[in-house]
Regions:
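Extracytoplasmic ligand-binding site segments that recognize negatively charged/polar headgroups
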Residues: 1-62
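Soluble non-cytosolic domains of exported or imported proteins
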Residues: 3, 33-37, 58-61, 114-118, ...
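Non-transmembrane alpha-helical segments in soluble domains
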Residues: 6-10, 40-44, 64, 76, ...
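Sec/Tat-exported extracytoplasmic proteins
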Residues: 10-17, 46-51, 71, 79, ...
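A generic structural-conservation signal
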Residues: 19, 76, 94, 136, ...
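Extracytoplasmic/periplasmic substrate-binding proteins
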Residues: 48-113, 150-159
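Mature extracytoplasmic/periplasmic domains
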Residues: 109-178
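Conserved C-terminal helix/tail region of periplasmic/extracytoplasmic solute-binding proteins
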Residues: 170-193
Length: 193
């Protein structure tokens, strides 16, 4: 879909990703008015370039597969899928410049099961604690949002479940990987789907 492809196209056309860190202000302002046309024109130019072309994917496993079989020389995709391919021996290198950070939300339904007895809140607190968020990164390369979780991981490296792999370098929220990024703006996309 358009989400993330338009952001990537604007960066490819010269808009600085680093201006998009605070909720996407600069980048998302550029998408107003002629910005959408600018992004679409960049996508068209990339897709019709005689030295390039585009393959659009619709399943998370496709980008590393396309790279591994030589059908494409670069791809966008989810870092966890690229990490898994690397762990399976595929010679891939992730580039973090202008990465797009998106996040998920936890929600508790008022009046739902375990609301009255406090169990739901207890679980939510544990899941979002520094240790709880870091714990999930033992199994998948999707990053915790808390800086304190990265510190927990650094102190416990090698962090990955195999007991050999340092995970912090593979985290999108590792400070080294955050030098130039786009923070997905859910408000923009809620208003412009």
């Amino acid at each position: 879909g358009a989400m993330s492809n338009l952001e990537i196209a604007l960066v490819a056309d010269g808009v600085k990703a680093s201006g998009a860190q605070a909720g996407g202000d600069l980048l998302y302002r550029k998408m107003e008015g002629a910005g959408i046309d600018r992004a679409l024109n960049k996508i068209k130019a990339l897709c019709t370039d005689p030295n390039g072309g585009c393959v659009f994917w619709n399943a998370g496993a496709q980008p590393p597969e396309l790279l591994a079989n030589g059908e494409v020389v670069m791809a966008t995709g989810w870092n966890g899928r690229f990490f898994n391919a690397q762990m399976e021996g595929t010679p891939l290198v992730q580039v973090w410049d202008a990465q797009i950070l998106d996040y998920e939300y936890f929600a508790m339904v008022k009046g739902g099961p375990n609301d009255a007895n406090g169990e739901a809140l207890k679980v939510l607190r544990e899941m979002t604690s520094s240790e709880g968020l870091a714990g999930s990164a033992k199994y998948i390369a999707y990053a915790p949002w808390r800086k304190s979780s990265i510190a927990v991981m650094e102190a416990g490296e090698p962090w990955y479940k195999d007991g050999k792999t340092n995970m912090v370098p593979h985290m999108p929220t590792n400070p080294t990987n955050l030098k130039s990024h786009i923070l997905m703006n859910p408000d923009y996309w809620a208003d412009n789907q």
